[in-house]
Each structure stands twice: as structure tokens, then as C-alpha cells.
């Protein structure tokens, strides 16, 4: 090689967390939810309306899944078989932006999800104390945490106690519109 044989080799042993991916259709079916059904998209609905509608439907589906996770049998069907019963089972939700985080938080409040979970937003506009609160696992809490954040947290933050992740599969990207000569955030599907 370029540096000869003197290049030190470093091995960092890590224990990966077992991950199981479940599509929304599978989760809805397993939960036997009657609150939510997936509707076909119309080819005639304008794209911007489709995004807004999809975001609303995704929020409703998220609330349905959060409620269903309180059922022990349903929860067990989603977890790896070797998960200990005493393990915290907090939920991390990835939403596309701050407005969607706030909308989902309000929907959780309206649907009574906050009786089951401590619903905690996590984004850059919050002060340090609010961010710290979302990232700290309470020692003696009967409730699970549901931390709602943007995909920025995927690579920069570890949220302890999380066993379930709900990802809308959406992100916001800055896009320049030459017609209006302005830049705006466009919600689009993530590539992964």
C-alpha cells in the first residue's frame, strides 16, 4: 500500500442492534386497526395536495400505531424474539419538518395519546432544556416516551430507550423556484 506495512489496523467491535423493518400495511394488518385504512391515490390530485394529504394520512397512521403498541401481543409481534420484557420501549418518530412535528403533537393530544405516552418534540428551535428533556430517559416514569423529530436526528443524536421507530419516509429540502425567484422547502419522499 501507499504507507507500506507500517499502517496500523484498528478494529472497533460494535454490537449492532437487531432491526426489523415492517411496512405500514403489515403493521396496520397486525394491529387489526379499524381506525385507519390506506386509500388509493388519485392521478388527478395535484402534487402539492398529494403531499399535504399524505402527511395528514401518515400522522393518522402514526397515532393508530402508537395506540396499538400498547397491546402486548401486537408489540411482541414487532420486536425481535430475544427482547427482554423489562426493556424500555420508547418510540422515535421521524417527521419531515417542525410544522409536521407540531401537527402530530397536537393530533396526539386530540386523540388521547398523551395519556399513554410522554409526547416530546425534538428539533433545533427548542431551547436546550426542552431538547435535554426529550433525550433523557426518566428513571421512574410509568409512561413511555414518544420523541417526534426530523430526519436530522438520524445521524446526529442517540435517543436512549427507543425500541420502535416510525418513519414517514419524507424529508424537506430547499428548492429554488425560478418562476417566483424564491427558495422554498419542498416535502418529498426520502430515497432510502
Regions found by a protein language model. Give the residues of each.
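P-loop NTPase motor module signature
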Residues: 1-192
Amino acid at each position: 500500500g501507499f504507507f507500506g506495512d507500517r499502517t496500523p489496523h484498528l478494529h472497533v467491535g460494535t454490537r449492532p442492534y437487531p432491526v426489523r423493518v415492517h411496512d405500514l400495511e403489515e403493521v396496520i394488518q397486525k394491529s387489526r386497526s379499524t381506525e385507519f385504512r390506506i386509500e388509493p391515490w388519485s392521478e388527478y390530485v395535484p402534487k402539492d395536495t398529494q403531499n399535504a394529504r399524505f402527511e395528514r394520512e401518515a400522522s393518522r397512521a402514526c397515532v393508530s400505531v402508537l395506540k396499538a403498541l400498547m397491546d402486548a401481543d401486537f408489540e411482541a409481534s414487532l420486536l425481535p424474539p430475544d427482547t427482554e420484557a423489562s426493556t424500555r420501549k420508547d418510540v422515535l418518530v421521524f417527521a419531515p419538518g417542525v410544522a409536521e412535528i407540531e401537527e402530530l403533537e397536537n393530533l396526539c393530544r386530540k386523540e388521547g395519546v398523551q395519556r399513554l405516552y410522554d409526547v416530546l418534540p425534538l428539533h433545533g428551535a427548542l431551547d436546550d432544556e426542552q431538547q435535554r428533556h426529550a433525550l433523557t430517559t426518566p428513571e421512574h416514569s410509568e409512561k413511555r416516551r414518544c420523541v417526534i423529530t426530523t430526519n436530522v436526528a438520524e445521524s446526529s443524536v442517540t435517543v436512549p430507550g427507543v425500541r420502535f421507530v416510525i418513519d414517514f419516509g419524507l424529508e424537506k429540502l430547499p428548492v429554488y423556484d425560478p418562476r417566483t425567484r424564491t427558495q422554498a422547502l419542498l416535502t418529498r419522499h426520502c430515497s432510502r
